[in-house]
């Protein structure tokens, strides 16, 4: 299917007064405490990961006040510390930050909402002192790990060009020794697709049984994915088929995020009408200066000729609700909504996808107001074909 791309259209007067009652609820707040990362992964989308910008502790009160005052914060949520390498902000920063956030929760959390903390980290800095902090609060740690060293170290290198696999595994050992809740996100590149058995056995042998696969994406400063080549779609399908075989017979249970999400939709007969990445204020991202955005977290640090940056406001001067009437928000929301509607009208997979992620549409097609992407073909369509085919075969329907 060819992507349907339209040029960005002027905002219609009829959408000037945006109905915000269907926005949210906010279930994920991503706080970017530092732009700096101690790795230099070659597929990273972030342009400023060499800069050592840090979130001042004084900004935490207006951040938490904005979160709890928002009309979109009506249910429990997670505070995810992400972008750059969040642990590079330092252990003492989080000791003070978590204590302050508890205080601000008591002051501003009038709805008595429950929230927890999570990190997405490369794991390199984790030691016993970090684990002591993680045990003090309800913390989940996501680790970026691409499988065995020969795959991981090809792309995830230090700033001096050395592989980071051994250091990441040391961090994981600390988490496991302390029974800290953790999971893995693995980026699949062209090379990964030849090694489903090796990746599966590596994770299983190291008791890493909760894994999500991210495709290497065309996004931000990563202007070309290694998966965007002839033949990789078929290789990816073969990878998924083999991984399904391996996980479906695994003891102990091995959970793959992509399989789990699709199976849940099939078993419950639910279908998606949207995703958190195209529904305003389901996700809120806040950077080290208090600037905030919504939709895809990847958009916050990016500047583009078409839209400028994706900063909608700042917690020091704006509420989440107030920016919904600004021209910038309405222009992006309009294009995002039009793209989702086109997906609804043209794609058989819409109920499994909900209209996709705007960042993928923008970076691949040049507009939010567009449809199918490479990311969609890999992440949704191929997974659906493999899982549905395997389930039908198991039921004798194939």
From Swiss-Prot:
GO molecular function term, any single one: metal ion binding
Domain of life: Bacteria
Annotated binding of [4Fe-4S] cluster, by residue: 37, 41, 44
Residue stretches making up the Radical SAM core domain: 21-253
Record key words, sorted: 4Fe-4S, Iron, Iron-sulfur, Metal-binding, S-adenosyl-L-methionine
Cofactor(s), names only, from the UniProt record: [4Fe-4S] cluster
One Pfam short name: Radical_SAM
Listed InterPro entries: Aldolase_TIM, rSAM, rSAM_SPASM_GrrM_OscB, Sulphatase_maturase_rSAM
Homology family: Belongs to the radical SAM superfamily. Anaerobic sulfatase-maturating enzyme family.
UniProt-listed NCBIfam families: rSAM_GlyRichRpt (TIGR04261)
Protein name: Uncharacterized protein sll1766
Organism in which the protein naturally occurs: Synechocystis sp. (strain ATCC 27184 / PCC 6803 / Kazusa)
């Amino acid at each position: 299917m060819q992507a349907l791309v339209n040029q960005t259209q002027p905002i219609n007067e009829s959408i000037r007064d945006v109905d915000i009652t269907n926005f949210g609820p906010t279930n994920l707040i991503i706080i970017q405490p530092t732009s700096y990362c101690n790795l230099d992964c070659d597929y990273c989308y972030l342009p400023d990961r060499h800069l050592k910008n840090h979130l001042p502790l004084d900004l935490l009160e207006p951040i938490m006040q904005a979160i709890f005052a928002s009309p979109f914060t009506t249910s429990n949520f997670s505070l995810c510390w992400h972008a750059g390498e969040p642990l590079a902000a330092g252990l003492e920063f989080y000791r003070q930050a978590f204590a302050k956030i508890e205080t601000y929760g008591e002051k501003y959390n009038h709805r008595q909402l429950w929230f927890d903390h999570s990190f997405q980290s490369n794991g390199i800095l984790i030691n016993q002192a970090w684990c002591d902090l993680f045990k003090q609060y309800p913390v989940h740690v996501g680790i970026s790990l691409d499988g065995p060293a020969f795959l991981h170290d090809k792309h995830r290198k230090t700033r001096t060009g050395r592989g980071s696999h051994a250091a990441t595994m040391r961090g994981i050992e600390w988490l496991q020794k302390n029974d800290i809740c953790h999971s893995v996100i693995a980026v699949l590149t062209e090379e990964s697709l030849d090694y489903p058995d090796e990746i599966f056995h590596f994770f299983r042998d190291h008791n890493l049984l909760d894994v999500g696969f991210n495709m290497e994406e065309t996004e931000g400063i990563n202007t070309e994915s290694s998966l965007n080549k002839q033949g990789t779609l078929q290789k990816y399908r073969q990878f998924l088929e083999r991984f399904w075989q391996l996980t479906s017979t695994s003891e102990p249970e091995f959970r793959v995020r992509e399989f789990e999400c699709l199976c849940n939709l099939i078993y419950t007969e639910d279908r998606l009408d949207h995703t958190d990445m195209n529904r305003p204020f389901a996700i809120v991202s806040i950077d080290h200066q208090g600037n905030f955005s919504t939709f895809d977290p990847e958009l916050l640090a990016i500047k583009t000729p078409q839209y400028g940056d994706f900063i909608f406001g700042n917690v020091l001067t704006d509420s989440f609700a107030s920016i919904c009437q600004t021209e910038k928000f309405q222009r992006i929301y309009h294009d995002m909504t039009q793209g989702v509607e086109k997906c609804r009208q043209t794609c058989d997979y819409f109920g499994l996808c909900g209209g996709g992620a705007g960042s993928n549409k923008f970076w691949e097609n040049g507009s939010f107001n567009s449809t199918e992407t490479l990311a969609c073909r890999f992440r949704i369509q191929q997974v659906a074909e493999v899982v549905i085919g395997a389930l039908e075969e198991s039921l004798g329907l194939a």
